[in-house]
Amino acid sequence: MNILLTGGTGLIGKALVERLCLRNEQVTILTRSSSPHTLSKHKNIKFITALSQLNSQEQFDAIINLAGEPIFHKVWSKNQKSILRESRLSLTTQLVEFINQYQQHPIFISGSATGIYGDQDEQKITETSKTAKTFTAQLCQDWENIAQQANGRVCLIRTGMVFSTKGGALAKILPFYKWGLGGKLGKGEQYFPWIALEDMVNGILFLLDHSECRGAFNFAAPKSIKQHKFNRTLAQLLKRPAFATIPKWLLHFILGERANLLLESQNVVPEKLLNAGFQFQYADCENYLEDILKNK
């Protein structure tokens, strides 16, 4: 396959590119960075910084859109919210226009997030569950609406928190737990959807290979976990205390609106992936944590 990938130098993108190269696919990575990448060692990868650099005759079998300004890294000022929207909506619009100019339309796999559902307490969330009206939920809805304007097969990946020791949220919090500084966020009763990086990549490849798959897919492990249970499990595996509790008011004081990402409860189920026959390597967070810490 000939594949165009955005976000190819991020945590998910790099892992995906490695797998695509093992499959001997041809990969073109659209990136804002002009610096050399470790991925450039692969002979079947090329880098571009704008769609205009592509040959007008070049035909892609699939376009995978993973690009976007990191959602949690900076305070959500009015300007930052504009950047978060622009980095997703503008590029996705360009990609849709690029796809629709061809008679043979490539598969379009485009990013989204489980944040589209907002806080739903204990209720199980599937792809048909109601969406919310928060900033992140509206961002995801607008992002998906643009992607769905592409002709051909479109898959939307509503991603939970991606776990890996190579980067992302888990890699950032591990040192704090090793220092005995782990703890509950609020009451700790909130579910948070998570997915192992390995399953994230396998899921994208599954969508590529299964032409019957289309529409929105929850990319989260079958078993969401409550924050207090995650906290206790990780602390026990590391043999460290984790008695701290950060109250909701303090999280909101420190993080502002971003605190909602840590406090919303989302018991997400990957119903469509499971019904399509996808098998998760890591369905249970406790088993996943035990496995990665044993091999770290």
UniProtKB/Swiss-Prot annotation:
* Recorded superkingdom: Bacteria
Quote the NCBIfam families the UniProt record gives.
Answer: yfcH
Q: Which organism is it from?
A: Haemophilus influenzae (strain ATCC 51907 / DSM 11121 / KW20 / Rd)
Provide the protein name.
Answer: Epimerase family protein HI_1208
Q: Which Gene3D superfamilies match?
A: NAD(P)-binding Rossmann-like Domain (3.40.50.720)
Query: Would you identify the family this protein belongs to, as annotated?
Result: Belongs to the NAD(P)-dependent epimerase/dehydratase family. SDR39U1 subfamily.
* Pfam families membership: DUF1731, Epimerase
